[in-house]
Amino acid sequence: MTARFRTVFVTSKPVIGMVHLGALPGTPLYDPSVDLIAAARADLHALQAAGFDAVMFGNENDRPYEFQVDAASSAMMAYVIGQLRAEITVPFGVNMLWDPMASVAVGAATGAGFIREIFTGTYASDMGVWSPDAGKAMRYRDRLGRSDMAMLFNVSAEFAHSLDQRSLPDRARSAVFSSIPDAVLVSGQITGEAAAMSDLEAVKAVLPDTPVMANTGVKHDTVADVLRVADGCIVGSSLKFDGDTWKPVDPDRAQDFMDRVRATRA
């Protein structure tokens, strides 16, 4: 476990709640009549009131996704976080799908404690063939003076299939050796779908000293089992009204989720 991870996440097996911003400027679904700040504020306060260990701001609504995020989208993400900064009482992170460099830039600019992205591997995806550069992203982080910002590596990308012939555990183990992530994330096939427990178990078995987190599809009735294996989780869709990714956070669902987490920890 890296010093950065321990510094950002003081709780054992942290649970990170997602603040999915509405579609941002420069994307097809952007609606200028939507108050992005008010919507993000409501989700943020619901998650903090429920007791989430951390929150992460993401641009899940910026469909169709791109490998290089529009500058206007990054600027708006940074602006929204800046407007809410004084109200954030827990560690927070940023993810600009599917752009590692934009994630680094926005995370650095807003004072985020961590970022999430795909940083390693080669994938065939809905967006095309995809080969991120972990070395470039990490060096960029350091040039921006944010070597303290933790980088969480998703090693099983949603909406994509790895072109690497190695097994997921081998790819995860190799990524840790070659690219020094602060944590490894294991995902399902798309947003809101769970990673197979067998995948979580296999990756954790080969990375006993590296945090391995469940990245997608953790639900109220599975979180206890997930946290018996994983070193934490990131959750979004399960917390929304009707469990719908595109709806706001339901304070009652968020509270119930963390009540179950606390029962597991006890």
Residue ranges and their predicted role:
Residues 33-34, 94, 99-112, 170-171, ...:
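Catalytic cores of alpha/beta
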Residues 165-184, 191-209, 221:
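Short loop-to-alpha-helix "cap/lid" segments that border enzyme active sites
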Residues 11-12, 17-18, 66-94, 132-153, ...:
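Alpha-helix-loop-beta-strand connector modules within alpha/beta enzyme cores
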Residues 51-76, 122-127, 181-194, 242-244:
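Glycine-rich, proline-tolerant flexible connector loops at the mouths of alpha/beta enzymes
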Residues 15-18, 51-64, 91-96, 117, ...:
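Short beta-strand segments at enzyme active-site cores
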Residues 20-41, 92-99, 153-169, 214-219:
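Active-site mouth loops of central-metabolism enzymes
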Residues 21-24, 102, 106-183:
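Conserved anion-binding
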Residues 17, 47, 55, 115, ...:
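Conserved, mostly hydrophobic/aromatic
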